[in-house]
Amino acid sequence: MALNSINTNSGALIALQNLNSTNAELTQVQQRINTGKKIGSAKDNGAIWATAKNQSATANSMNAVKDSLQRGQSTIDVALAAGDTITDLLGKMKEKALAASDTSLNTASFNALKSDFDSLRDQITKAASNAKFNGVSIANGSTAKLTFLANSDGSGFTVTAKTLTLTGLGLTASSTFTTAAAAKTMIGTIDTALQTATNKLASLGTSSTGLDTHLTFVGKLQDSLDAGVGNLVDADLAKESAKLQSLQTKQQLGVQALSIANSSSSAILSLFR
């Protein structure tokens, strides 16, 4: 049988403990709703917090990987654009050489064709030398290969440079013709240069496709990591909202229970009146 005492009100103590517990839960739920996270710090759940932090760091590092791969794409795109121009120039050079191989031409016409040929040749040098992105080129012979970031561990994606200069295509800065016979020979030389150029551009195209594919993969991997971190630490706001309402009701009842328990001491005093 419970004793009635004015020194120790066990009912009030129990009611106060329950109310404090409810208030603590309520504070936690409100914090989750305010931050949107169920794990906001290591004290909430050390193991999950550490895992989430590591995965989040990996996901964030993927931004550097994506930036590097995108630079790679742009570098190749510039080289491909220069290559398109160069193959067009080679085609026009072949046309001039073919026309100049006509032995029925007069000297003025032949010289005009030769001048056009030489001008087109010099434009190849300009196109190759200007094929740079952010000061870097894989078309002008300044580098043998470029390696871009492929993953957060620092591994790389290597692109082999394809020199599209005159030398890289089997020509020289003095490649020309002075006779119809030499012009005829030059046709074969230009055909070889064209084949070399298209082979190199095809290889760059394959590298570009590889970069595109890997960049897409990195984006999906980053999204998966972000989603995984969210699953670990994000709060279920619908669930927390329902819990908030329940705890608020429980808090109100706890306050009433504490008030009732505290009134028992007054009831004991009334017995002595």
Swiss-Prot record:
Keywords: Bacterial flagellum, Secreted
Gene Ontology molecular-function annotations: structural molecule activity
SS bond partners: none
Pfam families, sorted: Flagellin_C (PF00700), Flagellin_N (PF00669)
Cellular compartments annotated: Secreted; Bacterial flagellum
Cross-referenced Gene3D superfamilies: f41 fragment of flagellin, N-terminal domain (1.20.1330.10)
Keyword Cell inner membrane: no
Superkingdom of the source species: Bacteria
GO cellular component terms listed in the entry, alphabetical order: bacterial-type flagellum; extracellular region
Predominant location category: secreted
Keyword Secreted annotated: yes
Biological role stated in the UniProt entry: Flagellin is the subunit protein which polymerizes to form the filaments of bacterial flagella.
Family: Belongs to the bacterial flagellin family.
PANTHER family with a match to the protein in the record: FLAGELLIN
Subunit structure of this chain's protein: In C.crescentus, the flagellar filament is composed of multiple flagellins of 29 kDa; 27 kDa and 25 kDa.
The protein, known as: Flagellin FljN
Record organism: Caulobacter vibrioides (strain ATCC 19089 / CIP 103742 / CB 15) (Caulobacter crescentus)
Gene (UniProt): fljN
